[in-house]
Swiss-Prot record:
Gene induction: Expressed in the early phase of the viral replicative cycle.
Cellular compartments per GO CC: host cell nucleolus
Location, primary (coarse class): host cell
Record-given protein name: Protein OPG061
Superkingdom, taxonomy of origin: Viruses
Matches recorded under Pfam families: Pox_F16
Biological source species: Vaccinia virus (strain Western Reserve) (VACV)
Family: Belongs to the orthopoxvirus OPG058 family.
Swiss-Prot/TrEMBL keywords: Early protein, Host nucleus
Subcellular location: Host nucleus, Host nucleolus
Amino acid sequence: MKVVIVTSVASLLDASIQFQKTACRHHCNYLSMQVVKEIEEFGTINEKNLEFDTWKDVIQNDEIDALVFYRVKQISISTGVLYKSMMRNRTKPISMYFVRDCLAFDGDPPSFRMTSCNINAYNRSKIKDLIILMNMKTCNKKIIGEFIIDNFGSVDALLSIINSNVTWITSVINNSNGRGINIRVSNNKMLTITSFRRFVNKLKMYKTTKCASQLDNLCTEMNKMDIIDKK
């Protein structure tokens, strides 16, 4: 399957172009897709984008089987409307994949379906690397900040991952502190909470005061949980 990756940034809160490319490439590799072109846009995507030569070359090429986006929110109009606009200049159907959302759009009648998504494994690998870096005395704030941007796009994106993987992250933190992988952490709840708080408090250095409360909320929720360490 030949595909084109489409990345776009509409605000400072969006993941960086480079992060979107990395995630999309990883997804394409996981699904054995051949990337033949990459399109970078600034702003959301709508029918007007299709008027540019870059898009015309892709849309009118029936050898292209699919477009791979980072997420659905890149498109400011209905996905079905965008699809119909593209099909006016094609003889062969084209699919759209949305990596972060683990969704695919297969055309008319408009229908989304879930796809196999391995981005979580990618994120977990990078979080392990981040925890190692944060435990190294030789890594300064600049190095860690650049690592976060290069691998997660933004601190907001990283926080979203942390929020959905609290139990796993505490397990990794515990392991990095040398406590082993088969400890029932609920028996050492205060120690676990302290380790988690220390981790997110370090991340506060990379957040503005406006966004720091999100980290506090994570710690509050953590305090309410009974956690069993898992591999």
